[in-house]
Amino acid sequence: ACGTSVPQRWFEAMKKLDFIVASDLFMTPTIMGLADVFVPVATFPEHDGIVQPHFGRCTHFLGAMNKAVEYGETKSDLEICFDLGKRITPEAWPWDSVTEFYSWMLEDFVGFDFDELRARDAYQAPYQYRKYEKGLCRADGKPGFETVTGLVELKSLQFGAWGDDPLPYYIEPQYSPYSTPDTYKEYPLVLTTGGRKFTSFHSEHRQIDSLRRIDPWPVVEIHPETAAKYGIEDGGWVEIENQFGHCREKAHVTPTVDPRVIHAQHGWWFPEQDGEAPNYYGVFKAQINNLMPHEHIGKLGLGAPYKCLLCKIRPVMGLDD
């Protein structure tokens, strides 16, 4: 529901694959629309595991997850990978169990096995300060940082080697009031997206009733002057459109956005709606990525115009009307 620009294009491309297996905690539009087989995964109380809260091997803290309950035949993500790996390339999976794999990983990382982590409840690695002075930041063991020069680089020599400007620079968006004034006449508002709400993480948690009661609908923030200009009322449905696509969200009239800008939420779908084709939980109805073009990216292939496009808006009766 939020992974890419031009989502319908990717949806049609994925349908051409011969076979798709999906695993998740809940049914989703992707599963309903694409998966040949759905494997429900175990929730965190249903499997053993290791908590690494700070990006894997960069963590300073580890905790043990101890399986508390077992329901049906669900397996964790790692157990599914483990079972597949043992069958497809057994030489790459020499461990006899997932917990043995955890012990192997821990022995290399902190020097003790999974059973000891369970006994400890949690482990915090000792801190080392000024690692750059001791050669602990670089793969070659030399003092400094893991950059070409070993220094904190305000000028990135690596970017220069890749053919980009080694210094920060600004490029006007491909579609903006300044770069495309003719397009701006037809689509006179700047569209920005991607703001977060604490009730969800991208498309996650839309199916949790208590969180949906807090944020029941997708919202587009509009300045009062802009709302008055286009006849839009607070709480009313709005269609957002540009040359690439359209979607619908509910208006939140607020002075916190610039009158020239609207801010639309992303990652919406409606688990209460029909999940079968062609609806797929209504994932394309409030899909702000419908308005995002493909391949409008930076020189090195990064970025997309999720924060800076042009659009127009109009009041509508509802999500489907």
How would you describe each model-predicted region?
Residues 1-2, 26-28, 43-46, 67-69, ...:
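Short, glycine-/Ser/Thr-/acidic-enriched flexible segments
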Residues 1-37:
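Glycine-rich phosphate-binding loop of nucleotide-binding enzymes
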Residues 8-15, 37-38, 181, 206-210, ...:
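Short, solvent-exposed amphipathic alpha-helical segments in soluble enzyme
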